[in-house]
Amino acid sequence: MEDFHHISVLPDEVLQALSPKSGGVYVDGTLGGAGHAGLILTASAPEGRLIGFDRDEEAIAVARQRLSVFGGRVRIIHRNFAGIAQALAEIGVDGIDGFVLDLGVSSHQLDRDERGFSFMHDAPLDMRMDRSSGQSAADLVNTLPEAELYRIISEYGEERWAKRVASFIVKARDERPIETTLELVDVIKGAIPKAKWEERLHPATRTFQALRIAVNEELKSLEEGLQGLLSLLKQGGRGAVISFHSLEDRIVKEGFRAAATGCTCPKELPICVCGRVPRFKLVTRKPITAGESEVAANPRSRSAKLRVVEKI
């Protein structure tokens, strides 16, 4: 696992947002290479605790090694953060002082050919974050009805050529199963007219994103995990979420906004009858993005958006 690498995005901004303190309990729901976790544990010394979650077994192994210096202050759990509230209840945690979610696919996952996330190298068409369970991208590509493939590619990839891509996939798999990343890339390139390829975007980008989201149920996990984490925040506790595409950011933005919304009664009513009071306040009205120096050092940070909320 020594070659596992992942540069945490917006590290200073996350640390400033959470302002970890000794004695606090913090959650990293997307542990990855443990970059954010290490910073939080260091800042919350000597008594701050962190519970880290990840569904990638390789990431878990690396995080255990990298965070071993913090001893009993850290606990690592191999689990998708969608079920985070239940997982924390099982270990007796009923309140937290802060959480971070970094929703990006790690550099390690993208760069390891055998994981099947990248359209730049040939590999088995997998894309599972947790390779011990669930259907792979190849399973979806070779078994889903054309209409469902179209829905996934259109909705999750926001691909304008989704209908043609889905049609071409079905035609290709009728001849033989699509089993590798580059086999799928060839199908996509055939479906999208070359004259319509975007200058700075590989033609397979949106379809690969869509399949990755579908394989890992990323949006559903985000909705469930976010609500669970918000429900556990103590007064004054903060949540920080880093998203990388518009679908994720929309869920985070709307989730935070709903939590920070008070009375929803029609304006014509003289008094409030709904009884709704805001439970949170938005720390960031607009998302925080990476500066020029960080983007230069880590190009993947270019699309990162950080939103922060506080329990009141």
From Swiss-Prot:
Binding-site positions, S-adenosyl-L-methionine: A34, G35, H36, D54, F81, D102, Q109
Catalysed reaction equations from the record: cytidine(1402) in 16S rRNA + S-adenosyl-L-methionine = N(4)-methylcytidine(1402) in 16S rRNA + S-adenosyl-L-homocysteine + H(+)
Signal peptide, first to last residue: none
Class of this enzyme: transferase
Cross-referenced PANTHER family: 12S RRNA N4-METHYLCYTIDINE METHYLTRANSFERASE, S-ADENOSYL-METHYLTRANSFERASE MRAW
Function: Specifically methylates the N4 position of cytidine in position 1402 (C1402) of 16S rRNA.
Protein name: Ribosomal RNA small subunit methyltransferase H
Taxonomic lineage of the native organism: Bacteria, Pseudomonadati, Thermodesulfobacteriota, Desulfuromonadia, Geobacterales
Gene: rsmH
